[in-house]
Every structure is written in structure tokens, then in C-alpha cells.
Amino acid sequence: MLPGSLLSRLAFVLSLAAISAACGPAVSAKPNIIVVVSDDQGWADLGCHGMRSDVRTPNLDALAADGVRFERGHASAPVCVPSRAGLLTGRYPTRFGIETNADGPLPASEQTIGDRMRAAGYVTGLVGKWHVATSPANTAQKKSIPPDEILWGDNATVADPHLPGRRGFDEYFCGANRNYAASFDLAGRTLPGAPVLLNDSRFRVDVQTEAALAFIGRHAGTRPFFLYVGYFAPHVPLAPAADYPARFAHVADPKRRAGLALIAAIDDGVGRIRQALRERGLGQDTLIFFTSDNGAPLRPGMENGSLNTPLVGEKGQLTEGGTRVPFVAAWPAGLPAGRVYPHPVISLDILPTALAAAGVDARPEWKLDGVNLLPFLTGEQSEAPHRELFWRFGPQAAVMSGRWKLLHHPPDHWQLFDLGSPEGETRDLTAQHPGEVSRLKARLHAWAAEQSPAGLPAAPIRNPSNR
């Protein structure tokens, strides 16, 4: 009799074979893998969510139609730095001391998705926003970063020892806006003496798309590649290319118009990336993830024109509007098309899922918090991937378990919400369900005891840096 783990692996292979027979080419041993991350894009701003009639994302909608759209996809934190640290490691960022945007760099003890995919035989690349290097809160570091990069939080400087080239990425075009620390140029040529600081003042989303296309062109058809694309949009500054706002001339609010224009530019970029893959015969056997690092900011002076409708809250908060984000996975040769997945997932799941697609099992000693989603998406496993999901950010902490969500604010304030009810996070049910409150309190305390620092916040923290 075969061991359970072997049976599970055999069943997964057979399920891929069945999907492949229906979809076309057979699944290769190692598909190409691309992870696309937008910046501050709210849950409402994906056309296929059906929340807003002013959103136009035909390429992202097509990606969802060709794969799986996650109805309850979450970021690992409600702001940029910890969210990206979680995605890149597959571990809760609070486990290794990254909780706010003021924290960093990513500890050397943590292995990134670049490290893992390189070990799996992939050539690895990163384009765009990195934001897990040395914190610009450090005065000496500030002096070595171009002023626009300090303002917009990218930390791209050739003097930084925490660039992606030292964190598992063979090649990179790293930067958010104008200044890029790069190992190759937009023509696809290797830059001697890398990292080289390049300046390109053109529209940032287009530059980042061109860098992604250059990386694909360098490696298509040679060996499997892994590419992380960190678009710096629709995060402020609201400066889309001149032709994009005209698409939304009917939108009266100028910030909303600019935000929609930036999202449309990302959508165009994803379309160009997919077209490049198809032209090279790679469209069927490339696994693409798309998500946002957190929800949209809504407060006056911080808003970027994106929206979280109908969710409660915004960037920097642990209500749904802060962490529930667009989340799509498509792999025509390996996943069913047109599926809407109902169970909660989190960006921590991207790393182990990518590894599984590459034929690599996560090891227990890695202590990943994310899980391989493939058997859940192919139907091999029907239960929810996670019993609970957890967050801690500044003065807030939260645990989600199925339809229930418990929020904590210091010193001892608790709110229980039924996410399956029409009221969602607008009605506190702590008095009505004391048993659920007790159960989830215990789970949250146990999880918090494993974080660094351990425990739940005992007092409000001033300015947890949610910019």
C-alpha cells in the first residue's frame, strides 16, 4: 500500500494530467512562474469583482477567467513593507520582527522566494518595487538614497547591501520611480559592474513593464524562470502617462480618475506580459499570480483614488479593507479556468504554491506559514487551506477563522464580526457569541506568543508608519 503522502502526490499529478488533456499542452516539469504585485490597489478595483462600473481591467479580468479568482484573498499585512516581507518569505512577517513600514531590512536569516526558486533550478528576476531593504528611517541610509526614492519608499541604492541580487535574485531592475538599481537594461543587455544606478524619468509603470519584458526576452526558451514584478501603482504620486486619464474623462473626481488610470496602466502591463509569453509559446505553461500588497488608503491627504468598496476600512487597518485584496492565479496547463475560490487564502501561500508547481515540497524546518494551494484549486482537497489567518500591526491584532473575525485593540478591547452576514464588520457580536470570542482569543494569544516581539500590544503605538 502506498504511503499517504505518495498517494497525495500521485493524485495531484493525475489531476494535472486531466486538466492538461482538456487544456492543450502537457504540463512541463518546471513551468515559468510570474508574481505581479500592485501597490495600494483596493479590493473594489478589479473589474471582474463587479463592485464598480468605472473600473476597466480587461487583461486582469481575462487572467481571472483563465484561472482562479480568490473571493477572500488577503495580504499578510495592511502596509507595504511587512506585506512584501511576508509574500517574499511565505512566513508571517511578525515572526522576524517586520511589522510596520519603519522596519527593515529583511533579516539575513530569512530565505526569500528568490532563494527558494533559484535552488529549484530557476533563473530568478525582480522588477520594480522591492521595499524590504534598509529602512530609510536610518539617517545615514537616507543620505545614500536619491530624494525621490526616500519620499516614495523604494530604497533603491547601489550602496545598499540588501538589494535583491543578494537576496536570491539573479537579475533585477529594482526601483519604484525614476531611479533603478539594475543588473540589465531595458534592451535586455547585461550591465557590467552591476548593480548600476539607472535613471529613467518616463512613466514608471511602463518602465517596469518594459523591464519585465526584457527579462522574459533574456530567458524565454532557455531555462525555467521566476519573475517578481512589483508595480509602484496605484500608490501615489498620482502621475499616470498622459493618455491614460482620457480613458476616464467621465469620472468627475480627479483623484479617482488618476487612480483608475494607474490601474489601467498595470492592466495594460499584464496584457503585454501575457502577449509576450504567448508569442514565445509560453502562455499555456506559465503560472501567473496577481495581487496587491494591501488595501487602498482612503484618509484625506493619503488617498490614491483606489477604493475598497464594500469593505470596511483601509490601508493601515486590520479590517477587511486593509488586507483583503485582488488575488488571482492562472496556469492554463495546470489549473482549472473560470473558478471563483471561496475560502480565505493569504499572500504567504504564493511561495509554497510556486515551489509545488516547480516540483519542490516545502520542508518542515523552513517553518512556512503559507500552504501549497494547488491541491485545493484542482479539487484534490475540498476543505479550507487554513484553519485560521492572523495579523498584527502596531496597536491592532486580528484572527480570522472561517466566517468569524476577532479584532483586538489595547488594552483589552475586542470586536467579533461575522463576515458571512450582510453586516460584516459593521456589527460587533462579542456579546452574542462569547464562546467564539473565547476560542479565538486563545488562538490569537497562542499565535502572538510566537511572534517577535511576543504578545499582543499592551498600549496604542503612535504612528505605526502606514505610508
Set out the residue ranges of the language-model regions.
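Bacterial N-terminal signal peptides that target proteins for export
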Residues: 1-12
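Formylglycine-dependent sulfatase
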Residues: 2, 18, 23-414, 421-467
